[in-house]
């Protein structure tokens, strides 16, 4: 409840296999189940992750919220990363952005 941050650790497709459903648009808005989702911004912070800002509207209630998605890009398929440095940098970025927030981070 009240989540304003999502950490995504997998690519959408890996070696031709779907890993995760895409629930945000490339640009503009889309409807996904009971939500209208607007891509506000997308920034590549480094080769290991990018950050998206999504504006969500729950269609039945009209409630709106801005959610930040941190998308980790360099987790290798079927194994662990060779170094934890990029993942720790992502963790620091998430912690810095949401320090003091009382809402959960969805991973």
Curated annotation (Swiss-Prot):
It holds the Pfam family Y_phosphatase. GO terms for molecular function: protein tyrosine phosphatase activity. The keyword Cytoplasm does not apply. Keywords: Hydrolase, Protein phosphatase. Residues 1-107 form the Tyrosine-protein phosphatase domain. The keyword Zinc does not apply. GO terms for biological process: regulation of secretion. Gene3D superfamilies: Protein tyrosine phosphatase superfamily. GO terms for cellular component: secretory granule; synapse. It catalyses: O-phospho-L-tyrosyl-[protein] + H2O = L-tyrosyl-[protein] + phosphate. Its EC number is 3.1.3.48. Belongs to the protein-tyrosine phosphatase family. This is Tyrosine-protein phosphatase 1. The gene is STY-1.
